Amino acid sequence: MAIKDLTATTGDSSLPLIKSPPSETTGGDRTSALQTLGNIIVSIVGTGVLGLPYAFRIAGWLAGSLGVIIVGFATYYCMLLLIQCRDKLESEEGEEESKTYGDLGFKCMGTKGRYLTEFLIFTAQCGGSVAYLVFIGRNLSSIFSSYGLSMVSFILILVPIEVGLSWITSLSALSPFSIFADICNIIAMCFVVKENVEMVIEGDFSFSDRTAISSTIGGLPFAGGVAVFCFEGFAMTLALESSMREREAFPKLLAKVLAGITFVYVLFGFCGYMAYGDQTKDIITLNLPNNWSAIAVQIGLCVGLTFTFPIMVHPLNEIIEQKLKRIDWLQKHHNGYSNETGSVSKFAIFTTRTLLVVGLAAIASLVPGFGTFASLVGSTLCALISFVLPASYHLTLLGPSLNVWNKSIDVFIVICGLIFAVYGTYNTIVGV
């Protein structure tokens, strides 16, 4: 959950985190290849990419580049595993309605499997939401450093704003801000690349001063965690594939998009580290020069993300409110209220949404650094969602029909994913 918006739009409709994607029969709502391409990019690429140069600083430019490439390829492979699992499940049960990630967990491990899958996705989405707040707080505290306000101060200032925005039930009014934030994100990346080019032209740069492979072994899993965090978008894989008009073309389209994203990630991480070397900060925008154009980009990012935050937490609200509908006490005392959330009262909705924002803000205020937090989420939640679960489900559902080579790959991915999750978590907690 990079900083990632794990909702993708198809026309005016939203494809939420765990909610079932469009049915096979609703062909009129399907997306074109171009629309699907855009949805894939929105689902994967977020402001987490602005932490990649710092990961390259920790691991070294060569190790960082290879790590991003490996993660990009593994992401593509495991996304295809998910699709194969879903297709197998649909063919066995003969149902036209597309299955979700949680359905795969239920088929493989029963109710516990569904709860595990949805819990990991829910927690990862919380992690991405916390990262939004940390990113905004760090940038604003840097811009207004002369006022003596810390990151925590700005996060507290954001709380009432985000609470009010979270009460908006329709997200259509906020969707332009998501696009605005993405534009600012791209501009910030261009600024960093421009800085690097200018430093090379002016001679204020020495390639030999940049580390290729870190001598500290802990730097490699740290950078790997950040890379996994930047690629995480598995919660949307099945929904995006199901929503495409020509579903058979999805794997090829996904390969092209992920290849392009991987190239941009490597280029940006490399250029960012080359530009600032050991001075590279965990959010690269903090390295930008203190001029009006750089400050405008930072403020633009913060404004865009402030209004995008409700979109980020929307799937969380949906999950919580779906659970509330099953509580007998609420159904008994608020059965007079009926809308899209059923018998859940407005008071319950506003209360839970307020508590969610306050809780996420409290966690964000305790985060020691953006890079450390991104690596922690990537090493734990995202690694399990992206690699361990898809390979495990693939082995369970299609195991009898797989050859020895494919089974070996699945087992290898599961083992490597678990080792990476355990060691990466330990390494991030104790510090690089």
Swiss-Prot record:
A single GO molecular-function term is: aromatic amino acid transmembrane transporter activity
Is this entry keyworded Transmembrane?
yes
What are its GO cellular component terms?
A: endoplasmic reticulum membrane; membrane
- Cytoplasmic topology: which positions? 1-35, 84-115, 169-172, 241-256, 314-353, 401-410
Q: How does it sit in the membrane?
A: Multi-pass membrane protein
Its family remark reads: Belongs to the amino acid/polyamine transporter 2 family. Amino acid/auxin permease (AAAP) (TC 2.A.18.8) subfamily.
Q: Which PANTHER family match?
A: AMINO ACID TRANSPORTER (PTHR22950), AMINO ACID TRANSPORTER TRANSMEMBRANE DOMAIN-CONTAINING PROTEIN (PTHR22950:SF349)
**Protein's name according to its UniProt entry:** Amino acid transporter ANT1
Protein species of origin: Arabidopsis thaliana
Point out the gene that encodes the protein.
ANT1
